[in-house]
């Protein structure tokens, strides 16, 4: 009996795509005015990726696939992230997220964080303090102290 190879997506891919879609369309656009730009429902979000070498690159790709603008990419390892940098030739490149937020602060509506776990809270807090919306891989924080600091940001 021959089994033909299916081109359909599996459950994991569907849930991942649905999760990213829900996060970006229900969290960011509804309140994407705090960062300096006023958005209408027809405007595309200007999103920056922080930590794009592996999983973060996949997250940025999902956001780009939803039609949003990828305006900046940041990764400390330019060689490892070169493949992702090449996918978005119009996005500005950075190796320090703080410099990126300083230079492009008013142009960025939200950030996608795909850095190592222990850096999530610090980067998310800095982005939130600057009025940016955050999509972050889990865990967002490692302690109650970090969670409280994020809530205050």
Label the predicted regions.
Residues 18-88:
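N-terminal Rossmann-like dinucleotide-binding module
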Residues 53, 91-149:
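Beta-loop-alpha module in the N-terminal Rossmann-like domain of NAD(P)-dependent dehydrogenases
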Residues 57, 61, 79-82, 86, ...:
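Solvent-exposed, polar/charged alpha-helical surfaces in well-ordered, non-transmembrane soluble domains
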